[in-house]
Amino acid sequence: MGQKPSKPKAPPTTYESPRSSLTPDATGFGPEFCKSCWFERKGLIKCQNHYLCMTCLTLLLTVSNRCPVCKYPLPTKLRLEKSPTAPPPEATNPPPYSP
């Protein structure tokens, strides 16, 4: 008695994050390292104003969805800086098998 009917809850808003860039090799950036482990320079992902390596990003996403460095949401969608390439197909057939 005396209780007001509950209001229907609004659906949760989804945060549409833009894709973060994945840099395969950051040696051309100068002294850019992963801000979490300070070791990796390859496979860096841009997170706001710093970079994280894939290993640290994966580990951090298992704990929280916020970056411990900048407090912004961690990137979950990636955009490749360079398209992946494959070696050219061989023009000749491999030698026949001989035991």
Curated annotation (Swiss-Prot):
Bias kind Polar residues: ranges: 14-24
Name the record gives this protein: RING finger protein Z
Residues lipid-modified (N-myristoyl glycine): 2
Parts forming coiled coils: none
Compositional bias segments (type: Pro residues): 85-99
Domain of life: Viruses
PTM annotation: Myristoylation is required for the role of RING finger protein Z in assembly and budding.
GO cellular-component term (any): membrane
Protein localization: Virion; Host cytoplasm, Host perinuclear region; Host cell membrane
Keywords: Host cell membrane, Host cytoplasm, Host membrane, Host-virus interaction, Lipoprotein, Membrane, Metal-binding, Myristate, Viral budding, Viral budding via the host ESCRT complexes, Viral release from host cell, Virion, Zinc, Zinc-finger
ZnF (RING-type) ranges: 34-70
UniProt motif PPXY motif: location: 94-97
Oligomer and partners: Interacts with protein NP; this interaction probably directs the encapsidated genome to budding sites. Interacts (via RING domain) with polymerase L; this interaction inhibits viral transcription and replication, Z partially blocks the product exit tunnel for the releasing nascent RNA product. Interacts with the glycoprotein complex; this interaction plays a role in virion budding. Interacts with host eIF4E; this interaction results in eIF4E reduced affinity for its substrate, the 5'-m7 G cap structure.
Region called Disordered, residue ranges: 1-27, 79-99
Family: Belongs to the arenaviridae Z protein family.
Its biological purpose: Plays a crucial role in virion assembly and budding. Expressed late in the virus life cycle, it acts as an inhibitor of viral transcription and RNA synthesis by interacting with the viral polymerase L. Presumably recruits the NP encapsidated genome to cellular membranes at budding sites via direct interaction with NP. Plays critical roles in the final steps of viral release by interacting with host TSG101, a member of the vacuolar protein-sorting pathway and using other cellular host proteins involved in vesicle formation pathway.
Entry remark concerning the domains of this protein: Late-budding domains (L domains) are short sequence motifs essential for viral particle budding. They recruit proteins of the host ESCRT machinery (Endosomal Sorting Complex Required for Transport) or ESCRT-associated proteins.
Membrane topology: Lipid-anchor
Main localization category: virion
Organism annotation: Mobala mammarenavirus (isolate Rat/Central African Republic/Acar 3080/1983) (MOBV)
Gene Ontology terms for molecular function: RNA binding; zinc ion binding
Keyword Phosphoprotein: no
Ranges spanned by the short sequence motif PTAP/PSAP motif, renumbered to the chain: 84-87
Record-level GO BP terms: viral budding from plasma membrane; viral budding via host ESCRT complex
